[in-house]
Amino acid sequence: MGIQGLLQFIKDASEPMHVKKYRGQTVAVDTYCWLHKGAFSCAEKLAKGEPTDQYVSYCMKFVDMLLSFGVKPILVFDGRNLPSKQEVEKSRRERRQANLQKGKQLLREGKITEARECFTRSVNITPSMAHDVIRAARTRGVDCVVAPYEADAQLAFLNKSDIAQAVITEDSDLLAFGCKKVILKMDKQGNGLEIEQCHLGRCKSLGNIFTEEKFRYMCILSGCDYLQSLYGIGLGKACKLLRMANNPDILKVIKKMGQYLKMDISVPEEYIEGFTKANNTFLYQLVFDPLRRKVVPLNPYPDHINPAALSYAGTNVGDEKGLQMALGNLDINTMQRIDDFNPDAPQTQPPKAPRSSSWNDRCDKTATTQASIWSQNYEPGCTKSQSPTSPKRPPPTRGKERIVSVQSLKLPQRESQVKRPREDTSLSVDDLLEQYTAGVKRHCPETQPTTKPLTNDNKVSKENHCGSTSGPFRPRNRFATLLQWRNRSEEGTEEQGTCSRFFCHDESNIAETQEDSKQDSSQSVESQEKHVSQSGGDTSSLCEEPEREQDKDEPSSPPASPSCSSRPASVGLGVFSWSGTTKELNKSVSHPARDSTERQRSSSTPSGLSTLQQFHRNKARISWAGPGLSLSSSPVEGSEDAGNSPGSPPSQDSAYFSQSSSISASVENSLVTEDNSDKEKERDSVVSNSPSSSPLDRLKPAVNRTKVSGLSRKGACGQGKGGKIETSAPARASGLRRKPSGKKNVNNENSPGLQATISGLWGAFSFKKDSPKLSATKKGEPMSPVGENVVMETTQADKEIFIIAE
């Protein structure tokens, strides 16, 4: 039964542990605790009298677990009933019998669950059940000891005599017997709680004044198997009493218990006598000494105590019977012989190998090879080995001399991990950078004036010439080399800054067009050289990239000046021009004289952005002084594109070329000078900032309409915000535009031209929700509703004006 609440009272002294801490050592086991747990699983069969050995298997699982960790167990069993516990044993026996009868009655009524619970409480461990476990343990070479009376005293004796280094039990009485180390609540994995006697000082409730003797007194006063406690006295009150009392005579302290605790308690003489018997039972209970093979008291008798007067602590039956009882050869109740085990006889059957508790466990053979406690040459404490946590120390070398040579000494060191050697070790840093960079151009010095088509041999020779020539030749990355030279060959035919991979077409179309127009444009090239050379340094810089492109595409042509190109000047103006369509390019090439005439007309224009102004169409302003003079407004589509893109050649169908040069001159002279200067500045800013117009807009015949002075021109809302993109026609919903019936124009986005931005395209082709309101009082320059992207309803007066003008 133990002492109620003792483990919780001294929990500060307990600590978790694992049984492998005692590897190579010996532990004593209270086997009846395992038997009771194992019998709970087969309580119904035991109550019915059916044969079963489940309790044996349960106990052997713990034995195998201890052996697997290298711990040698000694199984200790209870012997005869102690005279001091006759009352306790009698009450327990009556309680078990009552539960058994109740369980049988519930089983007859069909209440199986309630009956099983009653059978569990009625479990009684018989000597025959203990003997079955002893036989199974002997097959594994495990020593077993049957105590003369109680197993608690026998366990304490084995621990005190250093035969067992620890005790495994579920009973807290072991601490009162004076055990040094007790393992409680151990599971099948070997985990449990360990309480050491030297750690009891950690408990704040006990304090430092407690000794082993006072601890035993406290356990007896709080109630134990040998004496029931007084009413209202537990561990707390008993501990308080012993801390307050300074008298070494415990009997006098017990008599004055009410005064110390300030309680109305009367201590009878029977209680004081029972306290004395209980204390002597804890001290002088009979046990069996396996080394001397004698029955001895737990502690030696003092001189003032008569052993015959301690019959309540056990009766000595003699050393011979005590040995046979300890070996398990005699029945403890009838004292009849049930077995003939002789530890001195040689074992004919080797012990069975213990079972491992897991896949990774290896059974330690040191536990089974240790000498038995029944052998003649057994010495207590010889099986105690060093703790596994403490490393094995080498023998001391003090006073010893030895010559040590360090010549062949190889110190342990971390080997540096060497990466696998690269196959392409002859590559230089520049070659590696060139292979993994996309925008870097490397031009090798050309020794020949003309370039030959690249072949495999030429590629290898050029690679050896440009790359690193030092070191032996090793295989290189063929794929990187081929891609590198392919990129170099393509650099001569296309410009990286203006090439669009989304809108570009095959370069073969442009190359064929240029080859067909070489002979026709030879004369125009000479006139263009003279004209462009006068334009200044800005124009030469703009034409520098087309010159490189011409040198690579036409190696057989004679070297040209840095500012010339095989294309018309309007096409080769770098990022400030739009090449237009292939159809328009053919027109400009087929009429070189007309292009040269237009260029000579603006030869006196300053350099820079003003040079590009010569390609800009000035919008004509009508002077109403002459009644017969009138100019056409902007065309429905394409006129604004032609005016905003200086690089595009003028179309023959546009309204701009439908007027004679004399009429244009007279109209321009009649314009207001202030408005003309302001508008010219605005056009210059638009020309320099606006992107190239879309080449997909098809040019339609111009509709000649006269501009009315009554219509006010929409103010520029984005003058301070950079370039404004003006559209050539009102914005229309996607998919509603009528597709042209003629041949689709060829997109020539690969030619150098200013790239359009997404924000500009959104501003140009998106719907405008609120159309600007026209003020009747504000007068301004007339505008075209189509050209300014303003949708207006034509009133009746406007229609009449248009009719009169026509």
UniProtKB/Swiss-Prot annotation:
Tell me which residues bind Mg(2+) 1.
Answer: D30, D78, E150, D152
Q: What ranges does the record give for the region I-domain, renumbered to this chain? A: 138-229
According to its UniProt record, the EC number is 3.1.-.-
One Pfam family this chain carries? Answer: XPG_I
CDD domains noted in UniProt: H3TH_EXO1 (cd09908), PIN_EXO1 (cd09857)
List the cofactors. Mg(2+)
Keyword field: DNA damage, DNA excision, DNA repair, DNA-binding, Endonuclease, Excision nuclease, Exonuclease, Hydrolase, Magnesium, Metal-binding, Nuclease, Nucleus
Q: Per the record, where are the segments of Polar residues compositional bias?
A: 355-378, 447-458, 533-542, 578-589, 602-615, 744-754
InterPro entries the UniProt entry points to: 5-3_exonuclease_C_sf, EXO1_H3TH, HhH2, PIN-like_dom_sf, PIN-like_EXO1, TPR_rpt, XPG-I_dom, XPG/Rad2
Q: Where in the cell is it found?
A: Nucleus
Q: What is its main location?
A: nucleus
Q: Which GO terms describe its molecular function?
A: 5'-3' DNA exonuclease activity; 5'-flap endonuclease activity; DNA binding; flap endonuclease activity; metal ion binding; single-stranded DNA 5'-3' DNA exonuclease activity
Which residues fall in a compositionally biased region of kind Basic and acidic residues? Answer: 412-425, 592-601, 676-685
Q: Cofactor note from UniProt?
A: Binds 2 magnesium ions per subunit. They probably participate in the reaction catalyzed by the enzyme. May bind an additional third magnesium ion after substrate binding.
| Region annotation (Disordered) ranges | 337-426, 443-475, 512-754
Annotated positions binding Mg(2+) 2: D171, D173, D225
Enzyme class, top EC level, equals hydrolase
Q: State any GO CC term.
A: nucleus
Which segments carry the region annotation N-domain?
1-99
Q: Locate the compositionally biased regions of type Low complexity.
A: 651-670, 686-696
Tell me one GO biological process term.
Answer: mismatch repair
Q: Which family does it belong to?
A: Belongs to the XPG/RAD2 endonuclease family. EXO1 subfamily.
Report the function annotation for this chain.
5'->3' double-stranded DNA exonuclease which may also contain a cryptic 3'->5' double-stranded DNA exonuclease activity. Also exhibits endonuclease activity against 5'-overhanging flap structures similar to those generated by displacement synthesis when DNA polymerase encounters the 5'-end of a downstream Okazaki fragment. Required for DNA mismatch repair (MMR).
Tell me the protein's name. Exonuclease 1
